[in-house]
Amino acid sequence: MIINNVKLVLENEVVSGSLEVQNGEIRAFAESQSRLPEAMDGEGGWLLPGLIELHTDNLDKFFTPRPKVDWPAHSAMSSHDALMVASGITTVLDAVAIGDVRDGGDRLENLEKMINAIEETQKRGVNRAEHRLHLRCELPHHTTLPLFEKLVQREPVTLVSLMDHSPGQRQFANREKYREYYQGKYSLTDAQMQQYEEEQLALAARWSQPNRESIAALCRARKIALASHDDATHAHVAESHQLGSVIAEFPTTFEAAEASRKHGMNVLMGAPNIVRGGSHSGNVAASELAQLGLLDILSSDYYPASLLDAAFRVADDQSNRFTLPQAVKLVTKNPAQALNLQDRGVIGEGKRADLVLAHRKDNHIHIDHVWRQGKRVF
């Protein structure tokens, strides 16, 4: 397959030319047009590496499309997979939560079904994107460590993050923001919210630290990439570094982001944060970190289509120094390197032919086609 007449987004530059794919890999690319009649006309669009998503909880929405509504696993997985490739994502780490911030939540009920669906569809080769597992460990929960010890042995596990959403710290250092979020999410009265908050504080005091240390030790032993989550202080970051974290997910302050970078951790922020112009929790904005050169990876988090959109917005933003190739690395090369996936994330000879062809119309990025290992999947 030859793709002609495209703007190739390479590691350090954008060049007009063509690209050849053979046996699922990029065979060659050139700053010239192919004269072969079978070459596909890219119509001057951008040709980028396939996007790599490290943290999406999008799968949850398809298994439970409405409260108390369970959807068949095969259909849910297929719909989620289709949305991933339609967003330009060719490698996706499906983030599933171990432990829940509230007993009786849908997360724990769906956990085994979601993991089984990911494993089975990958083995059968029916997925359009490549799906792997990101285990999000909610530390203040008594079931978290036993579940993790069971699930960490599953083949697709590629990344583990350590989360603590208890009130008064990290993402919810502002207790009013915490109450506003969870009271609205669970439709609690003021009295119920007060009880819930007290229960979460007690659980955190009992379980967070021992679970954090035990899970990190298991990740180091198995050489599984570890991510911190919502670090807010120098002390948080120092502990995350000591535990072996290679990614700092959603640091909530400038201080935490800067300290993470100094410790050699990749700073990951939400693409929706870029698109919306700030954090929904009132924490440090991803655009501010981009201005300071402290942004390494973007994740679509809860909105898959935000990933490519955010990369172009970063490149357009005159307040930072990101070129388009540098901005595209936030969603391609950098996440690949953080997970040691050396076969993808860049347009280069011998690399996987995971590719996205997109056009820009009225300041919006439209995805035309997506290929994974040379096979068109969108």
Curated annotation (Swiss-Prot):
Domain of life assignment: Bacteria
Catalytic activity: alpha-D-ribose 1-methylphosphonate 5-triphosphate + H2O = alpha-D-ribose 1-methylphosphonate 5-phosphate + diphosphate + H(+)
EC number annotated for this UniProt entry: 3.6.1.63
Pfam families assigned: Amidohydro_3
Coiled coil segments of this chain: none
InterPro entries: Amidohydro_3, Metal-dep_hydrolase_composite, Metal_Hydrolase, Metallo-dep_Hydrolase, PhnM
Molecular-function GO terms, alphabetical: hydrolase activity, acting on carbon-nitrogen (but not peptide) bonds
Sorted UniProt keywords: Hydrolase
GO biological process terms, semicolon-separated: organic phosphonate catabolic process
Alphabetical list of NCBIfam families matching this protein: phosphono_phnM, PRK15446.1-2, PRK15446.1-5, PRK15446.2-3, PRK15446.2-6
Family: Belongs to the metallo-dependent hydrolases superfamily.
Note: The sequence shown is that of strain K12.
Known role: Catalyzes the hydrolysis of alpha-D-ribose 1-methylphosphonate triphosphate (RPnTP) to form alpha-D-ribose 1-methylphosphonate phosphate (PRPn) and diphosphate.
Protein name in UniProt: Alpha-D-ribose 1-methylphosphonate 5-triphosphate diphosphatase
Species of provenance: Escherichia coli (strain K12)
